[in-house]
């Protein structure tokens, strides 16, 4: 009913509805407590409704603000809630907003000359690598909102996807400084090894790093061996991928058994 009649609602009615929803979610969080599942869900809902309210302001008054400003303001407004709520889902929402705001900013104003037109990928890599490092340090410090393995693995997944994309750039993109991309990818792999193998073991994160290695190595071999037009090139690439996957799987299985 509301969706069907939304355009017919007066301006003030739209704002009243959005603000009432925001107030209801905040009150629900205070009532149930931010440490409960219901309270966490309510606070996450409040964070999402805040974005809807900002979008409504921009749509109603035609502020002319850039899209990145919406996401940046959204992230700024929910930061106190993330700090006060001390819940992993809130920090994941905040990190997603920071990623979106930074990507949109770099896409319009960013360092295209430095990044070779790949500012978005570099932004993703830098933000999520820094977020994973900060998350691990705060987890080691014992802060409860950073102790949940599933949340850190989501951050690690985002970091791994971005790092793999940087590794791919080191192989195929002539516009990107390849030495810099290769160095960044190798540094990420080294940091993952130190944090999730030497200091403690997380098989999920290590499996993601292994997949990154397989993708980049296979692409590297495919590029330089395919140039020879040799009959054996596909066989060598397949053998390398199988060897990496098999060796990695055996190692990960052994680590999982040791941790069990």
Q: Predicted regions span which residues?
A:
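Alpha-helical multi-pass membrane segments and their bilayer interfacial helix-loop junctions
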Residues: 1-260
């Amino acid at each position: 009913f509301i969706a069907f009649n939304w355009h017919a609602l007066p301006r003030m009615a739209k704002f009243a509805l959005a603000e009432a929803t925001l107030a209801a979610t905040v009150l629900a969080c205070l009532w149930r407590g931010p440490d409960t599942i219901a309270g966490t869900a309510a606070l996450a809902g409040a964070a999402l409704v805040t974005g809807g309210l900002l979008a409504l302001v921009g749509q109603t008054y035609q502020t002319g603000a850039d899209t990145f400003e919406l996401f940046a303001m959204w992230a700024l407004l929910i930061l106190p809630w993330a700090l006060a709520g001390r819940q992993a889902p809130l920090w994941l929402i905040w990190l997603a907003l920071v990623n979106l705001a930074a990507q949109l900013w770099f896409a319009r104003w960013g360092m295209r000359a430095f990044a070779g037109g790949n500012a978005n990928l570099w932004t993703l890599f830098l933000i999520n690598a820094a977020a994973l490092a900060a998350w691990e340090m705060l987890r080691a410090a014992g802060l409860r909102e950073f102790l949940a393995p599933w949340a850190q693995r989501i951050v690690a997944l985002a970091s791994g996807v971005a790092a793999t994309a940087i590794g791919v750039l080191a192989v195929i993109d002539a516009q990107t400084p390849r030495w810099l991309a290769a160095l960044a990818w190798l540094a990420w792999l080294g940091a993952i090894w130190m944090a999730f193998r030497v200091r403690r073991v997380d098989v999920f994160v290590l499996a993601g790093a292994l997949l990154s290695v397989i993708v980049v190595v296979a692409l590297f071999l495919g590029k330089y061996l395919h140039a020879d037009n040799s009959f054996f090139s596909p066989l060598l690439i397949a053998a390398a991928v199988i060897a990496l996957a098999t060796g990695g799987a055996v190692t990960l299985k052994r680590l999982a058994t040791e941790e069990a």
